[in-house]
From Swiss-Prot:
The gene is APOD. The modification Pyrrolidone carboxylic acid is found at Q21. Glycans are attached at N65, N98. Residues 1-20 form the signal peptide. CDD domains: lipocalin_apoD-like. GO terms for molecular function: cholesterol binding. SUPFAM superfamilies: Lipocalins (SSF50814). It is found in: Secreted. InterPro entries: ApoD_vertbrte, ApolipopD, Calycin, Lipocalin_ApoD, Lipocalin_CS, Lipocln_cytosolic_FA-bd_dom. The keyword Transferase does not apply. Keywords: Disulfide bond, Glycoprotein, Lipid-binding, Pyrrolidone carboxylic acid, Secreted, Signal, Transport. This is Apolipoprotein D.
C-alpha cells in the first residue's frame, strides 16, 4: 500500500508540474462562502486578474460573462484571446448546489463531463470576486483552483492581497497564482 501511494504521489507530481497545476495531499477544503450571495448582482462581465494556473486556460484577456437562462440556470460564457489572435470561448451552465448556500454553485461545460464546484468566497459585486474550486482525486489528492475577478481589467494591489489572504487563511496555496494579461485586449461580444 505504501508503495502504491508513493507511485501515485510521483505520478501526480509529474502531471501537476507538466500542466502547471499542483496536486496536494488530502481532501478538498471547505472554505466559507459569500454570505447572502445574490446571483442577480453577480451577473455580467468579469475580467480575470489572477488565477492558480489551469490546463484549460492558456490565453490572455480572459473574461467571463454570467447571465440568467430561460430555464432558471446561469449561463457561463468564458472567453480568451489565443496567441494566434483568435478568440477561444466555451459556454456552460451553472446552478446552485443547495438553495440555502447560493454562493456554492456547480458548473458544467460538457454534457459528458461531471459538474465542477464554483464557490464564490467573496464579492462586493461592483469591483471584485474571489472564486474557488477543488477536485478530489480518489480521496487522496486534491487540485485547487482559484480566480480573482474584477469588473474592470485592473484591480488595486490592496484588493488582490485582501483576496489572497482569504485563500491563505483557508489553507489554499497562493504561491503559484499568476497574473492574467489584460493589456491591449479587444472587447469580446
Amino acid at each position: 500500500m505504501v508503495m502504491l501511494l508513493l507511485l501515485l504521489s510521483a505520478l501526480a507530481g509529474l502531471f501537476g508540474a507538466a500542466e502547471g497545476q499542483e496536486f496536494r495531499l488530502g481532501k478538498c477544503t471547505s472554505p466559507p462562502v459569500q454570505e447572502n450571495f445574490d446571483p442577480n448582482k453577480y451577473f455580467g462581465r468579469w475580467y480575470e486578474i489572477e488565477k492558480i494556473p489551469t490546463t484549460f486556460e492558456k490565453g490572455r484577456c480572459i473574461q467571463a460573462n454570467y447571465s440568467l437562462k430561460e430555464n432558471g440556470k446561469i449561463k457561463v460564457l468564458n472567453q480568451e484571446l489565443r496567441a494566434d489572435g483568435t478568440v477561444n470561448q466555451i459556454e456552460g451552465e451553472a446552478s446552485p448546489v443547495n438553495i440555502t448556500e447560493p454562493a456554492k454553485l456547480e458548473v458544467k461545460f460538457f454534457w459528458f463531463m461531471p459538474s465542477a464546484p464554483y464557490w464564490v468566497l467573496a464579492t462586493d459585486y461592483e469591483n471584485y470576486a474571489l472564486v474557488y474550486s477543488c477536485v478530489s482525486i480518489i480521496n487522496l489528492f486534491r487540485v485547487d483552483y482559484a480566480w480573482i475577478l474584477a469588473r474592470n481589467r485592473h484591480l488595486p494591489s490592496e484588493t488582490v492581497d485582501f483576496l489572497k489572504n482569504i485563500l491563505t487563511s483557508n489553507n489554499i496555496d497562493v504561491k503559484k497564482m499568476t497574473v492574467t494579461d489584460q493589456e491591449n485586449c479587444p472587447e469580446f461580444s
